[in-house]
Structure formats: structure tokens, C-alpha cells
């Protein structure tokens, strides 16, 4: 697909080496923690969600696996640059029973902005993340998940979103 979007063109150039590797998701931080990558990644994801009829305002929270903190921060900064408010929270790996609040110690499964009463999109870029587990935990905490975005195309995330009945989007990184 031909594009003239400068953000997408930059992302395509930066992501090319990742896409050629055997496990591009494992190398995603090389992109999201670089100056150029961080500057475009948040804009790309916000634009993609808008193209799928999910504008900021339709959601006010990004939920990301712990390993995708840089990508969540990129979205916050991109939204702020547009004069919009967006918060994020990170999903922490389970340390015990699979619930949003674990056992008597009250161990939290999320770190960041509160989830209760929030409408959220889920970032699905970490090879270590289980979308169903995050969705269940977020729902248990009172959040409504309306979409799932992935910076790199991910068939598992696409299948998860379809099964959950939520929007899925990822950029077209090919020509």
C-alpha cells in the first residue's frame, strides 16, 4: 500500500530490521526506545485507532503489558502534543492467583492510572502478554476494553481481538 504519511514512512524504515529478525516482537524495544521511533510510534497508533473509529475520547486509557511501557508513554506524549488527555496503566505479570487483586496482600496487577470506570485500548506488542488474561483482569477492575492496537502485525492479537469482539489495528509496514 502506497502512503505519503511521514510517520508511517519513518516507521517502515525503522521497523525493517525488526521484521527481518526471527522474533520481531522481542526486539520491539529497539524501536520504541530510540529517539526517532518514540517520536513516531505514539502518533502511528493514535492515527490507526482513529482510522478504525476510535478517537481519543472514545477511550481515555491505554493498557499495556509491562514490557510495552515505552510504547504506552509514546502514545501519552503524542496525545499531549495534540492537546488531548490520555492515561496509561501497565499490566504486571501474575505472581499468584489469576485475579486483578491477588490474595490478602492486595498485590496489584496494574501499575499506573486507575482502571475503574475507564474506557481503554489494549496494546498487544509483547510476546510475553496474554490478551485474554489482561482483558479479564481489566474488566474485573471495572475497565471497558474497546480496541486492541499492535505496532507490529500480530496474528495472535488479531485473533484475540476478533474473539473478544473488539477493534484490532496494526500499521501496514510493507510497501
Task: Walk through the language-model features, giving the residues of each.
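Short glycine-rich phosphate-binding loop at a beta-alpha junction
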Residues: 55-67, 149
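Short, glycine/charge-rich flexible loops or terminal/linker lids adjacent to PRPP-binding catalytic cores
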Residues: 74-133
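Short acidic, glycine/proline-enriched helix-loop-strand junctions
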Residues: 71-73, 79-86, 108, 158-174
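Conserved acidic residues
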Residues: 60, 118, 146
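PRPP-dependent phosphoribosyltransferase catalytic core
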Residues: 2-13, 137-175
Amino acid at each position: 500500500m502506497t502512503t505519503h504519511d511521514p510517520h508511517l514512512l519513518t516507521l517502515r524504515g525503522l521497523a525493517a530490521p525488526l521484521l527481518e529478525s526471527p522474533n520481531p516482537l522481542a526486539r520491539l524495544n529497539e524501536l520504541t526506545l530510540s529517539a526517532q521511533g518514540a517520536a513516531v510510534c505514539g502518533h502511528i497508533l493514535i492515527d490507526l485507532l482513529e482510522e478504525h473509529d476510535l478517537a481519543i475520547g472514545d477511550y481515555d486509557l491505554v493498557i499495556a503489558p509491562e514490557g510495552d511501557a515505552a510504547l504506552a508513554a509514546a502514545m501519552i506524549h503524542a496525545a499531549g502534543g495534540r492537546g488531548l488527555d490520555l492515561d496509561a496503566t501497565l499490566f504486571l505479570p501474575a505472581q499468584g492467583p489469576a485475579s486483578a487483586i491477588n490474595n490478602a496482600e492486595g498485590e496489584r496487577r496494574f501499575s499506573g492510572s486507575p482502571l475503574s470506570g475507564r474506557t481503554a485500548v489494549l496494546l498487544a506488542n509483547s510476546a510475553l502478554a496474554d490478551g485474554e488474561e489482561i482483558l479479564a483482569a481489566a474488566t474485573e477492575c471495572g475497565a471497558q476494553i474497546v480496541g486492541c492496537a499492535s505496532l507490529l502485525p500480530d496474528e495472535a492479537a488479531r485473533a484475540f481481538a476478533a474473539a473478544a469482539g473488539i477493534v484490532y489495528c496494526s500499521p501496514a509496514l510493507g510497501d
